[in-house]
Amino acid sequence: MTRKFFGTDGIRGQANSFPMTPEIAMKVGMAVGYIFRRKGQASRAVVGKDTRRSGYMLEKALVAGFTAAGMDVFLLGPIPTPAVAMLCRSLRADIGVMISASHNPFYDNGIKLFGPDGFKLSDQIELQIEAMIEGDMTPFLASHGDVGRAKRVDGDIYRYIEFAKRTLPRNISLNGLRVVVDCANGAGYKVAPAALWELGAEVITINNEPNGININEDCGSTHPIGLMKKVHEVRADVGIALDGDADRVLLVDENGTVIDGDQLMAVIAESWAASNRLEGGGIVATVMSNLGLERFLADRNLTLARTKVGDRYVVEHMREHGFNVGGEQSGHIVLSDFATTGDGLISALQILAVAQEQNKPISDVCRKFQPVPQLLKNVRTTGGKPLENKRVKSAIDEAKERLGGQGRLVIRPSGTEPLIRVMAEGDDRGLVEKVVNDIIDVISSESSAAA
């Protein structure tokens, strides 16, 4: 069934434009409140947000919807996405909401929903919400005496800081480690530096002064150049780059080299397998993860299960098949021993634990495999279904033949933007580049002709 509001990670779009309007946000609150409200009992929602200016507007609209449906609301303020999932369980809430567009620019925003178990909602529930939003909302309103209330929660970030710190083994501290943290002017700007400092690290923080419009602006995990320079400038042992809602992380080693999610998963998988902590006989990643990771794991008799792009699909596969490590190349790392969703801070702490335990520099710890040449390009589309076009399909089939058994080709529409993502990888770099560029050219020409 076609989805009108929900993408791969909740509802997302430009703030104050469809579907990210106060009206839609209020209807989401009403629909979700009705679905998760416990009849005859007090029910509650927890609502967090990142640092975007439009978060105030959407927060108030969601509160109106939830309270109209008879739910009480706990307002968490600016806080990481994984903290909302954790506090949803800790505060015995019936639903959790994070207002964020993750790594997108400030003018975008989104709504992510978590069930009472802290996991993102299923496709079926999201479709139910969509159907309710499109219909008459009157039947979902609470009676006069059952309208909900809202209150701010004090000390919520400190609960999360303590939770994150407890994931570092008690016999390990970060004493002697100089760490630069890029907070992306986002939701992790208070919690990440505090947690690292309390664990003993010398912390240098950058991009920790959010003003509502500078979130992800030339900073964070999608723009690590500033962090690379700072690590070199202060001679740090490691740099940690979060994104706007702190659910993803990339590292920078002491030489200023970026370490992506594939390498981080390799470190954790190898370490946890050696200590008999790894479950499922391997890890879960998406179709975008590098072939080098798959080969690295296979050499250690570990498997790589692949899913569609989106950490929700990674988590679903982990739960269904008994894995406890999964993630994405982009830096969403899911460690189900600790969390129900990607957690940038906790993932970084596990890597630092390995480095401290082995007494090795980050560059030695995190260079687990040589990535296979991989190229990802995006082409903007003007509507329609370009992947069903005859010329585009023919170009894709031809590309697969050229790559043969020595590479992979992944072509998919973005779940959050009007883009087609084209990724190829293989041992022959020149062939990979030619394959991607040829497909991009065909999609561009056919999309322009259709417009």
UniProtKB/Swiss-Prot annotation:
Key words of the record: Isomerase, Magnesium, Metal-binding, Phosphoprotein
Signal peptide positions (record): none
Pfam annotation, one family: PGM_PMM_III
InterPro entries reported for this sequence: A-D-PHexomutase_a/b/a-I, A-D-PHexomutase_a/b/a-I/II/III, A-D-PHexomutase_a/b/a-II, A-D-PHexomutase_a/b/a-III, A-D-PHexomutase_C, A-D-PHexomutase_C_sf, A-D-PHexomutase_CS, Alpha-D-phosphohexomutase_SF
Catalysed reaction, written as an equation: alpha-D-glucosamine 1-phosphate = D-glucosamine 6-phosphate
Gene Ontology BP terms: carbohydrate metabolic process; peptidoglycan biosynthetic process; UDP-N-acetylglucosamine biosynthetic process
Entry annotation: catalytic residues: 102 (phosphoserine intermediate)
PTM note: Activated by phosphorylation.
GO MF term (any one): phosphomannomutase activity
Binding site for Mg(2+): 102, 243, 245, 247
Family annotation (NCBIfam families): glmM, PRK10887.1
Protein name: Phosphoglucosamine mutase
Source species: Brucella abortus (strain 2308)
Gene label: glmM
